[in-house]
Amino acid sequence: MEELNKSGIYSKQFSLSQNKHNSERLQRLEKRLSGLHFSIELQKNEKIDKLNEKINSLEEKLIEMHENSNKTFEKLNEKLNDIRNDVTNYKNELEEFKNDHKKKLQLLEEKAEDFINKEKEDWSRLKIKLVKDFQHKAALLKEEMVEEYGLIEEKEDSLRKYYDCEINNIKSIIQNEISERIKTEKIILSDVDDKINEIMKIIRNEKTTRETYSENLVSLIEQYFSRIKKEIDMERLEREDTEETLVHLMEEALDKIGIPLA
């Protein structure tokens, strides 16, 4: 019986010792697990901080790219406005040039018409004067015929000769005057035609110059737009690459910290 009691006491002591040992092991294990958990949390926080730094850096780059893109579009709008102003000025100058030459041509036509009308009036006055002179001389001859009635035959012959001579002289004068007037009118018309042709040549040359300038301007605009489009496409590709890189880094970071993708 005593042996059984002793055996029970020893068994209890061994059990208490074993429990104490296990408790100490559990405490040490808890400390190690606590240290491991702290180390894991520390590494996790460091990785998250680094990831946040990378994300902030990428966000800054995206903001900078966005600002550069806005500046590029602002410059493009400014250049487009300059081009619009140049085209408007060109149209205004061309319209002013046309109006100026039109006014000059109208003025030249008015002067030519006034000159021709003046010449016609002078010619009409000259014809009236010649007729009056002829009538006056005829009246004088008639008076002389009446006064010298006794010498009518002689007077008639003299009158006929004089009449023929005067008529021939008057015809000659009139023909010469007509020839001079026609010659003068031809010279005037030729001069007017030359000036009109010269003005039309200037207008055609100016039109050709303007058309060449317009074609060169359109070519420069097309080249500029092509270059701007290439720059915009390059910026878009760089932005897409940056976004892809950001997504890839975020996926890697989530994989490292053990967070599953949604």
Swiss-Prot record:
It comes from the Eukaryota. The keyword Coiled coil applies. Residues 41-118 form a coiled coil. It comes from Plasmodium falciparum (isolate 3D7). Keywords: Coiled coil, Merozoite. This is Uncharacterized protein. Possible candidate for an effective malaria vaccine as determined by epitope response in sera.
